[in-house]
Amino acid sequence: MVRRIGVLMGGLSAEREVSLRSGRAVCAALESRGYEVVPIDVNRDVARTVRETGIELAFIALHGPLGEDGAVQGLLEVLGIPYTGSGVLASALAMDKIATKKILAHAGLPVPEYRELEAGDADSARAVVAELGLPVVVKAPTQGSSIGVYIVEREEDLEARITDAVAYGGTRVLVEKFIAGPELTAAVLGNREPRVLPLIEIVSATGKYDYESKYTPGLSDHLIPPRVPREVQERVSDLALRAYRALGCRGFARVDLIVSGNEAFILEINTIPGLTDVSLFPDAARAAGMSFPDLVEHLVRLAQER
């Protein structure tokens, strides 16, 4: 039985502070259940650190590039250490919003209409506005926590927002048709037989669910159940499960969707959802009757089934 668990947190991405909050919460939960916990603030010496600590299992509480994108997962595979969450391929695919959309669309799942643009291609940017209309959403394709996400309402602002998004790395951006409607999130839990926990509707006090709204208490409400018809909720749960399976996720993931009328569109998949005191996945687990320590321990058990 696994007793010595390393909690990998912090890391090198723009989501470092959120990851530290998730990691500390996980450490406390594991300690409350009697595990020997080794907090590991991930840096470029992580391979040596993991070997020297002698951990039996890694609980990955990292967010963003070099943590959620398959890099650390691959390292742990090489070291022969079991870990929580999805494997290398699913992690890498879900971290890239453009790759995710291509896979979901190929699987016949609904996604907002989108285009992939290279920075500096002004002609293509103008063509996108003509094709998608305004407003559009510009996204840095390999960031999370709404980092590098901009709603563009005027054509003259598009190139500047593309430049802003590219500043987070790479040369590509995702430009997505803006869809107005309630935003729902589906927490999916499990390996071969995953299940969807109670759905959550996200209501932001500022009108947009950005980084500040996500991680500042009081700036967003998590409504359970969502204020959409039962048949829409069932549709959202089904889409979330199908998306989870299409990418080959394991352990847990959070699928974000937008609802327009009776239709739902998948926005993205988060393979390491936030585990802070204001995060969505723990709220969904609580609504399903799982305390936070219950959830964390269940993720450890799922990791051992790999």
From Swiss-Prot:
EC top class, as a word: ligase
Organism: Desulforudis audaxviator (strain MP104C)
InterPro entries: ATP-grasp (IPR011761), ATP_grasp_subdomain_1 (IPR013815), D-Ala_lig_Van_CS (IPR000291), D_ala_D_ala (IPR005905), Dala_Dala_lig_C (IPR011095), Dala_Dala_lig_N (IPR011127), PreATP-grasp_dom_sf (IPR016185)
Binding site for Mg(2+) 2: 268, 270
Function recorded in the entry: Cell wall formation.
GO annotation (BP), single: regulation of cell shape
The ATP-grasp domain, residue ranges: 101-301
Name of this chain's protein: D-alanine--D-alanine ligase
GO molecular function, one term: metal ion binding
Subcellular location: Cytoplasm
Binding site for Mg(2+) 1: 256, 268
The keyword Nucleus is assigned to this record: no
Binding site for ATP: 129-185
Pathway: Cell wall biogenesis; peptidoglycan biosynthesis
Cofactor note: Binds 2 magnesium or manganese ions per subunit.
Domain of life: Bacteria
Keyword ATP-binding (UniProt): yes
